[in-house]
Amino acid sequence: MKKLFIAFAVLYALAGVAQTKQLQYLSGTDAAHTVQWDFFCTAGHNSGEWKKIQVPSCWEQQGFGNYNYGRDYKTNGKNSRFYDEKGMYKYQFKVPAAWKGKNVNIVFDGSMTDTEVKINGRSAGETHRGAFYRFKYDISSLLNYDKLNTLEVTVSKMSSDASVNNAERLADYWVFGGIFRPVFLEATPKQYIDYVGIDAKADGRFAMQVWTKGLAQNAVVVTTITDATKKIISTVKTQVDKSAENTVVNTTVSSIKTWTSETPNLYTATVVLQDAAGKKLYELTEKFGFRTIEIRHGQGIYINGVQVKMKGANRHCFWPETARSLSSENQLMDALLIKEMNMNAVRCSHYPPDKYFLQLCDSLGIYVLDELAGWQKAYSTKAGELLVKEMVIRDLNHPSIIFWSNGNEGGHNKELDDDYGAYDYSKRPVIHCHHRPGNAFNGIDCNHYEDYYSTQKILNDSLIYMPTEMLHAQDDGGAGAAMEDFWNLHWRSQKSGGVFIWAL
């Protein structure tokens, strides 16, 4: 029944405009809507024979393999070892004959940890290393169109790159294995827009970087901005040189409604790529908000010219029955809980969340610290460069994201600090969420787990102080102990950026 539903969804999409991106899910869309694949686990529970598994999922929660806690090596010392079983997946699928001649990618939203992909027995590309990031392969030349195709995926629980294990798995949380976020195909024409990066300011200035691919001639980009009622408020045409990597669109929109946590006003940019004769080549839409982020050194954090203090919590992507693989309902429950507690911010500890959670933060009004994995140890520069790129390009147009966090508590590879701005057209600030004094960055001290008196001292220093973890049950006399006293200190201080408690 699920396969029939997916097939009907594909046919419905094909009936639409062929110049848009077309999607076909191979897995389910979340933990509550899964698709059964063939699965072989190499060690641990239910290993050694081909069985069935739901995708997306963490295989431990499906009864396979072995459980690991990331700090077991601290508890058990030299006798500790991480289980390192592999999971081998197989799935057969068809793609429409009409997709022949298009660019077809297979996209993984998250897979723990090293992921090797084959289509019809042929490699799709290099093994991907890093669990929490969207990655894709161009499989256009590997497919049988309108015939059965065989997808084979081998997932290694532990990475062959020691720095990836250090950043993601030797950590104070449960570590899992498996394809835990959706897998889908995307098909585009040969001439298309890869992605856009939007920088929309509170005064109505709108700038957008348009990254095109495969242009056979000079072209035109027509950008139409609509408000929440679908009213057109601006249209602008921009010439595109076929030899240019990207094109910048500029305009100013009057009488806009700004985005903040209290007024999460969203707009839609419809971006159409046309040839010189006006024929539509491709179209995409992107939601965004008009807002300006400022770090005023020694003063505070300002959104749209108004000082804002974060009343935030740290959040893991976790549900007891499904681990890191979440349902849309799980995500909504967390987002609503944040709003119901009168919080205005969330730190994505300690890795990028599902994209749907960011969409909820956009629409409900929650400020976000989007974090590269790095729990007290960092990715190598070689590994981290790709993962920063994948994180930023996926997330760059969410108005809720106001900071990029380059790792946690010493897991900061400072050689990656400049990489965020290379892909983020709006140049959001980068911070270091840390637990040692002296690690302030971009004018913000984020030092964790200070006591009341040291908090007073830091707030009287020259830097903005925004502890990105505080009031841990093990470190501060009980979870939430003296919350009112700490908050009053921050509320009265000009230099406070607010706080993030541990944890949601």
Model-derived features: positions:
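Surface beta-strand/loop "capping" patches
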Residues: 187-216
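Substrate-binding/catalytic cleft of secreted carbohydrate-active enzymes
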Residues: 335-338, 345-504
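Bacterial Sec-dependent N-terminal signal peptides
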Residues: 1-22
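N-terminal carbohydrate-binding accessory modules
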Residues: 22-29, 196-199, 258, 270-339
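Conserved, mostly hydrophobic/aromatic
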Residues: 121, 183, 267, 305, ...
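Beta-strand-rich binding/interaction modules
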Residues: 117-119, 205-241, 247-249
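Accessory beta-strand-rich segments of carbohydrate-active enzymes
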Residues: 40-44, 79, 84-193, 215, ...
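Accessory carbohydrate-binding/adhesion or oligomerization-edge regions at the termini
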Residues: 19-71, 154-158, 163, 228, ...
